Amino acid sequence: MLLYVTLILGCWSAFSESAETDVAERANKRPIWIMGHMVNAIYQIDEFVNLGANSIETDVSFDKDANPEYTYHGVPCDCGRSCLKWEYFSDFLKGLRKATTPGDSKYHAKLVLVVFDLKTGSLYDNQAYDAGKKLAKNLLKHYWNNGNNGGRAYIVLSIPDLNHYKLITGFKETLKSEGHPELMDKVGHDFSGNDAIGDVGNAYKKAGVTGHVWQSDGITNCLLRGLSRVKEAVKNRDSSNGFINKVYYWTVDKRATTREALDAGVDGVMTNYPDVITDVLNESAYKAKFRIATYDDNPWETFKN
């Protein structure tokens, strides 16, 4: 009996040490969000997640009254992609909700973050607040199910124009007036126009944003772009007084570019080919430093190694 107890305790001790080692190794690896690019049709959610994406980017176009209308990019778009796939925005949100609600037959546990690329270029500056207000109402009804067991993914509102910072204000104030200010815990922000980092910071000050900031940098895969601004964003992220929490680079379709982006310290890679990014992350040099982010990773928290 004593021998049996000794064996059990020995096994438990070894198991505990192994578990502690796994936790420590996980904590030392930067979590990476593989962002499936231009996922605008509901069926593409499955397609991109099955290829390895744990995040998707979806385009949102607005009508003349600042209502979010379609998930649609249009031409031109990335080389090698169809630019014309679309859904009604409300329908896409319902499909997305199913894909991110535990227990649903379409649920993907892996899909933890959604970037809405808000095509506000069709709007006047003074419509930005209304666009945020109407966007919030759509998400509240069709994605969050009015706060009753809705989709669980984190949401990034990506705005191309710094002058449209009031979209953030309209979104936040609407969730509050509708009785669900807590949902802002699931919402982050990005200005995607490749503006000067200092100008981006000033826009956030105007919007009253003090956290949950992703900073994008990039260009269509048809063209080349260096990593100098990415490195500037990473420097801001890692400084004691920076406003950026996470940095992502788009559109990355090649292994060499993926390695360069990871070496620069990004947290996310937006791609048309998630399997390419997964392959690079599985290379020994990168497997030791990075891991694919899960729902347990807070996308608003700056990674400290």
From Swiss-Prot:
GO molecular function: lyase activity; metal ion binding; phosphoric diester hydrolase activity; toxin activity
Signal peptide (residue range): 1-18
Enzyme nomenclature, EC number: 4.6.1.-
Primary localization class, coarse: secreted
Cysteines engaged in disulfide bonds, as pairs: C77-C83, C79-C222
Keywords: Cytolysis, Dermonecrotic toxin, Disulfide bond, Glycoprotein, Hemolysis, Lipid degradation, Lipid metabolism, Lyase, Magnesium, Metal-binding, Secreted, Signal, Toxin, Zymogen
Cofactor note text: Binds 1 Mg(2+) ion per subunit.
Catalytic machinery residues: H37, H73
Cofactors, names only: Mg(2+)
GO biological process per UniProt: killing of cells of another organism; lipid catabolic process
Propiece residue ranges: 19-26
CDD domains associated with the record: GDPD_like_SMaseD_PLD
Effect of T258V: Little decrease in enzyme activity
Function: Dermonecrotic toxins cleave the phosphodiester linkage between the phosphate and headgroup of certain phospholipids (sphingolipid and lysolipid substrates), forming an alcohol (often choline) and a cyclic phosphate. This toxin acts on sphingomyelin (SM). It also acts on a broad range of lysophospholipids, like lysophosphatidylinositol (LPI), lysophosphatidylglycerol (LPG), lysophosphatidylethanolamine (LPE), lysobisphosphatidic acid (LBPA), lysophosphatidylserine (LPS) and lysophosphatidylcholines (LPC) of varying chain lengths. The substrate preference is LPI > LPG > LPS > LPC >> LPE, LBPA.
Family note: Belongs to the arthropod phospholipase D family. Class II subfamily. Class IIa sub-subfamily.
Name of the molecule in the record: Dermonecrotic toxin LrSicTox-alphaIA1ii
Protein species of origin: Loxosceles reclusa
Lineage of source species: Eukaryota, Metazoa, Ecdysozoa, Arthropoda, Chelicerata
